[in-house]
């Protein structure tokens, strides 16, 4: 972990393409197979990729309710608190139709999407938080049909995931994962309904399938490895910062972590504490590789330079742990989510804070945002002009149409003026 000054870091900073282009033919073939053969293809891929035989793709409502009913009380309460906070936050930011004066002639109205598919990762871990951070938003938006897909497991889908589906009132849950599940949600099969939009994180196969099928179905984003950048000073609790770094690193060997400070000694102390804690860290194989290859210590000469580095990285998660964090809130502009102070660690945002943890990665925070309830709404503009308003603006409209040589456009105006 060599320390770099800000300019050295910026000179070498680059992000590799988040997706492996060699996967394209594989994804194309999987999608075509699902499009043609439907459920038969899904069951074949469950056996091939997930080593699980699935006679029935859909998990019954009785199984979903039983998972909730038999869940231990502490887990049930934790999931419920997370749900309530997410729901309250999303309700507070939801775009709503306003009561307008009759004189208002141009305005917007919002409608919930009809159907949404949610991808919940599986594999070695269970992610009920992904259900909460996506399905709750769709529920608050008023989406009519919420469908969850998640990879099958030999011992069945995680009970915690099913319990989260029960809490968020998901309509259907299917045990199918990977690119094949994205294709199923896009095209529809005998049992899985076609949806209007697909959200939720996944591996490269899932991300590439979403990219490949975008246009036939809406998507939230093309997600890459997780990342965090922290701006810290001498007042930061470095032992806590160590675990803020490890928390991101344990997700993925490609997870990126950045520590930025105007105080070089703070960075040296952090490096020493990371080195001391690393040998005994949980998930050592993953964390150690991430730290070795994707961890950066960046010495900024002043406040403006620290903010410039942060905005250039445009990380999924940004954490400000300094004596006076307030100035950073206005200056740090391009991040997925901004966590301020010692008691707002990024991990609290993963689970219970309220905003969704589905956030832009790979510098896409420079032009897009984290998932919210409003991503499950359509926005329609309404134009309802009076005769007086039409007469005031018609000449300009027909003249612009004439300039563009679109004479039928022009005639559409002129015929109303006559």
From Swiss-Prot:
Q: Which GO terms describe its biological process?
A: L-histidine biosynthetic process
Q: Where, in this chain's numbering, is Zn(2+) bound? A: 248, 251, 350, 409
Keywords for this entry? Amino-acid biosynthesis, Histidine biosynthesis, Metal-binding, NAD, Oxidoreductase, Zinc
**Might you give the EC number(s) for this enzyme?**
1.1.1.23
Its UniProt entry gives the catalysed reaction(s) as: L-histidinol + 2 NAD(+) + H2O = L-histidine + 2 NADH + 3 H(+)
Q: Does the keyword Metal-binding apply?
A: yes
Residues annotated as binding NAD(+): 119, 180, 203
Its needed co-factors are: Zn(2+)
The active site lies at 316-317
Which class of enzymes does this protein belong to? oxidoreductase
* Stored SUPFAM superfamilies: ALDH-like (SSF53720)
Please provide, alphabetically and separated by semicolons, the GO molecular function terms listed in this UniProt record.
histidinol dehydrogenase activity; NAD binding; zinc ion binding
Q: Name one GO cellular component term.
A: cytosol
Q: Which residues bind substrate?
A: 226, 248, 251, 317, 350, 404, 409
Q: Which pathway does it serve?
A: Amino-acid biosynthesis; L-histidine biosynthesis; L-histidine from 5-phospho-alpha-D-ribose 1-diphosphate: step 9/9
Entry cofactor note text? Binds 1 zinc ion per subunit.
Give the function comment from the record.
Catalyzes the sequential NAD-dependent oxidations of L-histidinol to L-histidinaldehyde and then to L-histidine.
Q: Which PANTHER family match?
A: HISTIDINE BIOSYNTHESIS TRIFUNCTIONAL PROTEIN (PTHR21256:SF2), HISTIDINOL DEHYDROGENASE HDH (PTHR21256)
Q: Which family does it belong to?
A: Belongs to the histidinol dehydrogenase family.
Entry protein name: Histidinol dehydrogenase
Point out the gene that encodes the protein: hisD
């Amino acid at each position: 972990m060599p320390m770099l000054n800000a300019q050295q870091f910026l000179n070498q900073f680059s992000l590799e393409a988040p997706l492996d282009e060699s996967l394209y033919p594989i994804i194309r073939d999987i999608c075509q197979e699902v499009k043609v053969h439907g459920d038969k293809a899904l069951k074949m891929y469950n056996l091939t990729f997930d080593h699980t035989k699935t006679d029935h793709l859909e998990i019954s409502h009785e199984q979903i309710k039983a998972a909730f009913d038999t869940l231990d009380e502490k887990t049930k309460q934790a999931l419920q608190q997370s749900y309530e906070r997410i729901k309250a936050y999303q309700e507070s930011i939801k775009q709503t139709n306003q009561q307008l004066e009759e004189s208002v002639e141009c305005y917007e109205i919002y409608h919930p999407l009809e159907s949404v598919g949610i991808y919940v990762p599986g594999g070695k871990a269970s992610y009920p938080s992904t259900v909460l951070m996506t399905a709750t938003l769709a529920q608050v938006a008023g989406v009519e049909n919420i469908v969850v897909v998640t990879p099958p497991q030999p011992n069945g889908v995680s009970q915690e995931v099913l319990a989260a589906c029960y809490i968020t009132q998901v309509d259907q849950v299917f045990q199918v994962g990977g690119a094949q599940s994205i294709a199923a949600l896009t095209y529809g099969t005998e049992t899985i309904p076609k949806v209007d939009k697909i959200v939720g994180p996944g591996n490269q196969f899932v991300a590439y399938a979403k990219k490949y099928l975008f246009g036939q179905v809406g998507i939230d984003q093309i997600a890459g490895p997780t990342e965090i950048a922290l701006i810290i000073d001498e007042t930061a609790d470095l032992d806590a910062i160590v675990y803020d770094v490890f928390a991101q690193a344990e997700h993925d060997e490609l997870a990126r972590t950045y520590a930025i400070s105007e105080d070089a000694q703070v960075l040296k102390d952090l490096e020493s504490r990371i080195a001391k804690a690393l040998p005994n860290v949980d998930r050592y194989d993953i964390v150690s590789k991430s730290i070795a290859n994707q961890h950066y210590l960046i010495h900024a000469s002043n406040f403006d330079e620290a903010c410039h580095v942060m905005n250039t990285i445009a990380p999924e998660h940004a954490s400000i742990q300094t004596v006076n964090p307030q100035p950073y809130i206005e200056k740090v502009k391009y991040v997925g989510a901004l966590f301020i102070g010692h008691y707002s660690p990024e991990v609290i945002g993963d689970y219970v804070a309220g905003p969704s943890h589905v956030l832009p990665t790979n510098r896409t925070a420079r032009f897009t945002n984290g998932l919210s309830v409003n991503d499950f709404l359509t926005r329609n503009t309404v134009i309802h002009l009076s005769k007086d308003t039409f007469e005031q603006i018609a000449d300009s409209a027909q003249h612009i149409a004439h300039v563009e040589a679109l004479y039928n456009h022009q005639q559409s105006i002129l015929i109303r003026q006559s």
